[in-house]
Amino acid sequence: KYISPINEPNGEWSQNPNQEGSFATKADIYKVVYELDKAITNASIPTKIIIPEIGNMKYLFEADSIPKMPDNLIEDLFTRQGEYCVTKFKNLYQCIAAHDYWTTYPPKLLVEMRTKIRNAIKNIPLIKFWASEYCILEQNEEITMPPSPTRSINLGLYVARIIHHDLTIANASAW
């Protein structure tokens, strides 16, 4: 039903052969969606395209020091003012997909980032937000401790807090 052709376009994947991802500029993302939309239409396949599957939610808004790094993706891909607006493609599922990595701690950052997402998409007609990938990669005092039943409970509560905030603050329609 869905296809996600680009994974974590903000990552410089040539530096780590043990990870998968597909670095892509906003122009690359637009071209992929354009070509895939055309192919899906021509083949009459009942499939929707999901993008951008960004690996860090900050790139939905912020710029980075790397010039080609895709940033400000909500405005540039999902609003009519955006140079690479993809909302016109009929096979695009109208959602912004993002991964939760590196935006979960401290709790203040968790809340701030999800509030930014909610505020950014509330005035874009029909656009939803999906929290589309997460596993614990961070190391912080809430979850870093020797293996024990307490650690297992803390890890579960940590992930539950992320899910809760994605659903209730960012209004994620999928997790």
Question: Model-predicted segments: where are they?
Answer:
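Substrate-binding and catalytic surfaces of secreted/luminal carbohydrate-active proteins
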Residues: 19-175
